């Protein structure tokens, strides 16, 4: 029960290295700087929590954050940006005192905490969360992250959630309920150490944007997307950009009827040798810029239809091993070669 005489606030230690979250009546008695939990500051690039770093001025002095036992009685509805750009933050203690049962917005909560190695999320209640966008963006030092307790049944936005988590080698998302999610854009972007990713439990029936979803996942050797429902997806631009270790990719379940963006979709997939796109309907696609650029091991693209797209500069640039109806010609790399009669496609 929240006592109206109590106040949620954040206290900065005198040496500016410790942030402590309190919910009590003692704010006026504490030495040093304090901010109300809703206090913000405005800079050119946006509005930020008063105690955090900003895009223009990241915080490099805070080393630890602590949730005092008093904070357990507070019920925030947002934790967005609470630790944003605290670049030297190494530990968060007392997370068991943070009750997130009423929190709807966790966007950017740990964004830019590039020194955090672990975060204990076992007590996190995400049952009312709607937005987890950018939640762990640029947490570059995280080597493990247990989100198995997350209830994501009400979440609609998880774009860029793990973007830049370049030290994560594995991620168990088997408990994730994505049935309401509509935006998966950049979700695993820059997760360059991930070697496997099991998304078999993902329900993507409401997803409209999956662009850059696996961008830069350069250590992924396999990726099973057979369970993906792509019937509402409109943008898959850059979806597999830089997945340089993928040796195969089965997209036979992809429904592309609503898609209009495929720019850079496979750019830099330098280990792919064949792609079966015979099920692709690209009639609405208006951007195929650099779609297969740099796929220098790609020998065969199976597709029985002719694709037409005005914005297709360098679509096949660097596909030096590719051969369809005709062998690869470095002077012909746009969508005029996206056909099985006089181009680089092979009939299946």
Residue ranges and their predicted role:
Residues 1-348:
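Negatively charged
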């Amino acid at each position: 029960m929240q006592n109206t005489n109590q106040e949620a606030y954040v206290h900065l230690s005198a040496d500016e290295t410790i942030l402590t979250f309190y919910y009590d009546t003692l704010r006026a008695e504490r030495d040093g700087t304090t901010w109300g939990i809703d206090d913000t500051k405005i800079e050119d690039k946006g509005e930020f929590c008063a105690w955090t770093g900003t895009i223009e001025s990241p915080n490099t002095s805070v080393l630890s954050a602590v949730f005092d036992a008093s904070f357990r009685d507070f019920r925030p509805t947002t934790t967005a940006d609470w630790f944003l750009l605290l670049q030297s933050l190494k530990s968060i203690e007392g997370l068991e005192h943070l009750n997130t049962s009423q929190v709807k917005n966790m966007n950017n909560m740990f964004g830019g905490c590039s020194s955090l190695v672990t975060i204990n999320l076992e007590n996190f209640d995400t049952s009312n969360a709607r937005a987890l966008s950018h939640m762990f963006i640029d947490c570059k030092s995280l080597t493990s992250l247990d989100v198995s307790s997350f209830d994501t049944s009400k979440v609609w936005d998880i774009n860029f959630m793990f973007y830049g988590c370049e030290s994560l080698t594995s991620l168990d998302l088997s408990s994730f309920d994505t049935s309401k999610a509509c935006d998966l854009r950049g979700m695993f972007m820059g997760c360059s150490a991930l070697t496997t990713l099991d998304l078999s439990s993902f329900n993507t029936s409401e997803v409209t944007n999956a662009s850059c979803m696996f961008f830069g996942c350069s250590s992924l050797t396999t990726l099973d997307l057979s369970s993906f429902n792509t019937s509402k997806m409109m943008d898959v631009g850059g979806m597999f950009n830089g997945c340089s270790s993928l040796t195969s990719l089965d997209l036979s379940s992809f429904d592309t009827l609503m898609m209009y963006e495929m720019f850079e979709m496979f750019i830099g997939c330098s280990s792919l040798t064949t792609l079966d796109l015979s099920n692709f309907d690209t009639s609405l696609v208006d951007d195929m810029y650099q779609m297969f650029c740099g796929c220098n091991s790609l020998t065969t693209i199976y597709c029985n239809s002719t694709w037409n797209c005005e914005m297709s500069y360098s679509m096949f640039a660097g596909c030096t091993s590719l051969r369809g109806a005709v062998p690869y010609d470095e002077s012909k790399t746009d969508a005029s070669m996206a056909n099985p009669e006089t181009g680089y496609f092979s009939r299946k």
